[in-house]
């Protein structure tokens, strides 16, 4: 159940209006009734006035019993369904669902064009048009913030940082030594631009290396809560356009992440490694330092990468190997344990 404390339901919406709204990503196969749809719900909870969706075939069995008035399904879906449920076919049903959420819901919390009195903003800082600057925000000298941006409560933006237009920077973020593009979202507690973990060791003493690089973040990037992105020692740390970085990710100094890559929670990338374009790193993946990971690489969850990977490869395990080899290793290990247990019982 969606809480009305936080989200406003914009329904009811006519089914015909929903089809019109999604017209460019669905494939209408019939004339739809002009019925009222009040909400979006999962198949198991939907009522006769709700719409649902199916993107994972594991849940297809619920289409036989769901009470939903309509359901968005994959393009080639042909399984048996409740005869009272209207099917709407989409090339990507999950994407259609994500668009439909915007059609049905809006957050209760809204941001006006306002600078809160408790915000501390340096005289030399430049704040664009139609910005919201929240309570106890600190913006230091020579900062530039683009138009239509939101800087929420308790965030710190250090001297000289440049943030593009349409940014959404949530609470208690700190940003130093960074240039950030347009349409960027940075979630609660993220830390960007701090020193990296760089030391030179001489006679048993670890001497701190002064970091003189910065962090460069492209356009339309999202960075999750409590993620940390270190600035470079000599070469900059770079996050290219369209990247999606989950919560609790550590990105070391001098790392480059290519366009459109996605990194899942608790992954860690050591200094000076380069991740190619449109790569996917699963949860808790570890990438050693000074490696090159080719475009389109996929690393399964908890994979440990210790050597370069050619583009387009899918790997898993630690140390990471081609995914089919990893599956074979897992099967062999299971068989060895089973055999060992049998011998111990004897």
Swiss-Prot record:
Belongs to the transferase hexapeptide repeat family. LpxD subfamily. SUPFAM superfamilies: Trimeric LpxA-like enzymes. It comes from Rickettsia prowazekii (strain Madrid E). One of its GO terms (biological process) is lipid A biosynthetic process. CDD domains: LbH_LpxD (cd03352). It catalyses: a UDP-3-O-[(3R)-3-hydroxyacyl]-alpha-D-glucosamine + a (3R)-hydroxyacyl-[ACP] = a UDP-2-N,3-O-bis[(3R)-3-hydroxyacyl]-alpha-D-glucosamine + holo-[ACP] + H(+). Keywords: Acyltransferase, Lipid A biosynthesis, Lipid biosynthesis, Lipid metabolism, Repeat, Transferase. This is UDP-3-O-acylglucosamine N-acyltransferase. The keyword Acyltransferase applies. GO terms for cellular component: membrane. It holds the Pfam family LpxD. One of its GO terms (molecular function) is N-acyltransferase activity. NCBIfam families: lipid_A_lpxD (TIGR01853), PRK00892.1 (NF002060). It is an enzyme of class 2 (transferase).
